[in-house]
Amino acid sequence: MPIGVPKVLFRNPGDPISSWVDVYNRLYRERLLFLGQGISTDLSNQLIGLMMYLSMEDENKELYLFVNSPGGWVIPGIAIYDTMQFVRPDIHTICIGLAASMGSFILAGGQLTKRIAFPHARVMIHEPYSAFYMAQVGEFVMEAVELMKLRETLTRVYAERTGKPFWVVHEDMERDIFMSATEAQAYGIVDFVAVQGK
């Protein structure tokens, strides 16, 4: 079995010859985006670039962002969220598998009434963490202040997107809260749980 991203035949409109493109490239052309790993600066920049390009290409055609992510870096995650709010097309978010930490933040950032979780998906929220354990005291204090600002931002956005009171979200984020698809719907992170269809 070959290793790597599968290739599929694709013909651009007006082009007489089909060419082999990787499956993700083909799906992007249908406005289907994937967040399928931990959020990093590189991944964030790629998704942001795709959202901007597809928005410029057709600002009325909706985008679909499939989320299966354990989370990742906070600032790149916020950058994805902000871009989702900035671009003209509505962005549907669909949780397939796991949307944890910043993954759930991005899931909640989809267009209201267009956020979906598959029936067996899992969603997890918690407060942001810092990796600066070996810093000097002054740096550690500055890092703690910045972390508190980020926590405030995340809590405020979750409260706005879910309709929950700020204090409820603040308390819930103090520990890892795992939810089923129906629990995530009740919490307000998603609007619907997908039903199985054939």
UniProtKB/Swiss-Prot annotation:
Location in or out of the cell: Plastid, Chloroplast stroma
Keyword Transmembrane in record: no
HAMAP family: ClpP
Gene Ontology, cellular component aspect: chloroplast stroma; endopeptidase Clp complex
One GO term of the biological process aspect: protein quality control for misfolded or incompletely synthesized proteins
Keyword terms of this UniProt record: Chloroplast, Hydrolase, Plastid, Protease, Serine protease
Phylogenetic placement of the source organism: Eukaryota, Viridiplantae, Streptophyta, Embryophyta, Tracheophyta
Record EC number: 3.4.21.92
Listed name of the protein: ATP-dependent Clp protease proteolytic subunit
Gene: clpP
InterPro entries: ClpP, ClpP/crotonase-like_dom_sf, ClpP/TepA, ClpP_Ser_AS
Self-association and partners: Component of the chloroplastic Clp protease core complex.
Task of the protein: Cleaves peptides in various proteins in a process that requires ATP hydrolysis. Has a chymotrypsin-like activity. Plays a major role in the degradation of misfolded proteins.
MF annotations from Gene Ontology: ATP-dependent peptidase activity; ATPase binding; serine-type endopeptidase activity
